């Protein structure tokens, strides 16, 4: 492995799913100049196994791993340089995480414009994966809200990029580019104004997959800023696809109960506990998932105008630190795909295949995506987005390869932030602009200074 100084450590790394481990030399420093020098050493060596930036490791796949090479932990580079309530702009280092940003920005009446399923994500990672959230139909993905970024490229230069400037092509290749165009050092994000830290939520339950699809197709989505659903992927038809749908918008002060109005912008997102690493493999199965799913569905119910805090409405899993340990040391595979809106019958077939497979998932997300952005490798396209978590067991690899084939056949795609096993051939077929992206990448990094396990697997170098 390439040595870049005393602060590096050989470390076994995985994604959040705890699969596909590899060992890399990890550099962890708050010194931006040291990061620049480390990249220069990789370049001077001719690239070798290369370098890749890593944030909090919440990607489920291998995009922030670099076996035999250098991984640069960006979390110490975490200064919030400025917050401007008038322009709604924040100037922040790439290692700032969304939890930290939310706490700092709320007193200014500003909200993070796009939140994924956890706040434990760095800004650099949010850009590199072009994360999306419950408001994709109304706000798009994270890259839509980046007004500029400073990118350390393979030649040692730090380039200031904007979405419409001279280097716009490189800007959009970096959004969703999984860190392979360079290292995002700093960014300016346009935030969302808010008068409270709470949501006004409406809940609905559906009895079948057809009802779930109908609810998302009747035009009511446009009334809500945020929308997502848990759905049942275990029960046989007609219960298959039944859902607990949660939709809402940020609350105004007038909508809050009296006890909350004195501190409407108070950050209210409690964590209950951190799970110990004691759970055996196999505990997550049909017999545990089935009753939990039934309970979750029954307790959800129909409601209107409920005031909820950030954890209740958006991040229930953040109440449990290290919740991925519940799947045991073998881990789990999070499979996320999107199918074009018009291919609804094909989408329903895939859900049926998942239910009949013998591979069971409880933590299931259903979301109808809105318009896509300009980034060649950005995941969201208008369509039916599904995310399921499969415990690792025999036969899973063969099954998800068959799912890949169906998703591709129906015009869909997988999300790089959730994948550590699909093939280069499949990925390239799913992303028709991948050659355009590779061309941009090679212009700024002809020596392949920036590399990762994912990049080698998907032939992106």
Swiss-Prot record:
Effect of residue 387 to G: Confers resistance to BTZ043 and PBTZ169. Loss of covalent modification with BTZ043. Decreases M.tuberculosis cytotoxicity in macrophages
Pfam families in the record: ALO (PF04030), FAD_binding_4 (PF01565)
E.C. no: 1.1.98.3
Gene3D superfamilies noted in UniProt: 3.30.465.10
Biological pathway: Cell wall biogenesis; cell wall polysaccharide biosynthesis
InterPro entries per UniProt: ALO_C, FAD-bd_PCMH, FAD-bd_PCMH-like_sf, FAD-bd_PCMH_sub2, FAD_lactone_oxidase-like, Oxid_FAD_bind_N
Annotated phenotype, changing residue 17 to C: In strain: TRC11; Ty38c-resistant mutant strain lacking Rv3406, but sensitive to moxifloxacin
GO molecular function: D-arabinono-1,4-lactone oxidase activity; FAD binding; oxidoreductase activity
Catalytic activity: trans,octa-cis-decaprenylphospho-beta-D-ribofuranose + FAD + H(+) = trans,octa-cis-decaprenylphospho-beta-D-erythro-pentofuranosid-2-ulose + FADH2
Quaternary structure note: Monomer. Although forming apparent dimer in crystals, DprE1 does not dimerize appreciably in solution. Interacts with DprE2 to form an epimerase complex.
Family indicated by similarity: Belongs to the DprE1 family.
Main function: Component of the DprE1-DprE2 complex that catalyzes the 2-step epimerization of decaprenyl-phospho-ribose (DPR) to decaprenyl-phospho-arabinose (DPA), a key precursor that serves as the arabinose donor required for the synthesis of cell-wall arabinans. DprE1 catalyzes the first step of epimerization, namely FAD-dependent oxidation of the C2' hydroxyl of DPR to yield the keto intermediate decaprenyl-phospho-2'-keto-D-arabinose (DPX).
PANTHER family linked: D-ARABINONO-1,4-LACTONE OXIDASE (PTHR43762:SF1), L-GULONOLACTONE OXIDASE (PTHR43762)
Protein name as annotated: Decaprenylphosphoryl-beta-D-ribose oxidase
Source organism (scientific name): Mycobacterium tuberculosis (strain ATCC 25618 / H37Rv)
Gene (UniProt): dprE1
